[in-house]
Each structure stands twice: as structure tokens, then as C-alpha cells.
Amino acid sequence: MTTCCVVIPTVGRPSLCRAVSSAHGFADQVLVVADGAPHVEADLHVDLGCPGLVRNAAAPHVWTDFVAFCDDDDVLVPDVYRRGLEMHPAVDMLIHTMAHPVLGPVPRPGWPLDHGNVGISFMVRTDLWRANPFIAGPPATFRGEDFELVRRFMDQGRIIAMSTEVGYIVRPQEGQS
């Protein structure tokens, strides 16, 4: 069976427990990386100030075949992630649809995968992520790290599959998951 880790960068939001619980719903390993939050119970503590670099800090500790990512104020839909791996066993990256409270589904159906139409709702082969870590965006923006990784995989001709099922919920409302 294919194994998966979920890396959750956190700054200590109250919603962290909900994110961790959603990850434990399917992951073989869950790593919480606290960024500038020494008071937070976490597997790793860093002070990097950039979500992509915080995610990268977990790389040496991931022992699974695939790695997925979840922000500390979001949740994953467990069955969707596991089913996606079963349906696409040869993929290098699997992008799940993200339910965004303002934008609706992301990636938006019929739109190209470009900046603004890709979120962090993907999983990637761990060895490829280690070889192609997140690159920090322009200073003080922290935008585009997720798309930049997807773009590099597209440029490399990697096998990327798209799931139309919602697998990631951005800032869910109470009772939504």
C-alpha cells in the first residue's frame, strides 16, 4: 500500500487541532512544523517566516512514499486523498480540487493551471519533493510557492493527475469538513 505524510506548517492558530485531525484521517505520518511559535506543540520548530520554507524543513523527517500539505486553518477530506492515490498509482503529483470560500473550486474547471488557479491541495512523491523543494516567493508576499512547484513539475514532464473531487477545504465554517 502506498504511504502518505501530511505536513502542516503552523503559526499556532486555534484551528490547528482540526487540521491535524483531518490529516490523521488518512495519513500514515503527520508532521506539524511550528514557525516562530515556540509555545505550539509540534514535531519541529523553525523560524523561517515563509510557508514553503517551513514545509521544506519537514523533508528530512518524512518517511512515506507521498507527501501532502495542509495549512493550519484548513482541512483535508481523507477518503478523497486515499482514493486519489488508488485511482492514479503512477502519478508524480496529484492535484485535488480545493473548496475556497470566496473563489469556489480551485483549480477552476476549464481554466489552465496557472498562478491563482492552483492551491496547496496536492500530494507529490516524497523523493521528487526533496529534489524540487518549495522556493520562497518574493519577500513579504509568500505567494506563488505552490504554483511554482506545480509549474516546475509540468516543465519537467512529470505525471500530474487532477482530481475533480473536493479534497481540501479552505478555512471551513463550523461543522463543514
Positions of predicted regions on the chain:
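Short, well-formed alpha-helical segments that are part of the catalytic scaffolds
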Residues: G12-G25
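Glycine-rich, basic loop-to-helix element that forms the pyrophosphate-binding segment
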Residues: V46-V62
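Acidic donor-binding/catalytic loop of UDP-sugar-dependent glycosyltransferases
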Residues: D74-M87
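Short beta-strand-to-loop element that shapes/binds the nucleotide-sugar donor at the catalytic cleft/hinge
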Residues: L94-P107
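Catalytic beta-strand/loop signature of glycosyltransferases that borders the donor
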Residues: T97, I160-G167
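A recurrent flexible, glycine/aromatic-enriched loop bordering the glycosyltransferase active site
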Residues: P105-V124
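Acidic donor-binding loop at a coil-to-helix junction in glycosyltransferase catalytic cores
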Residues: T141-L149
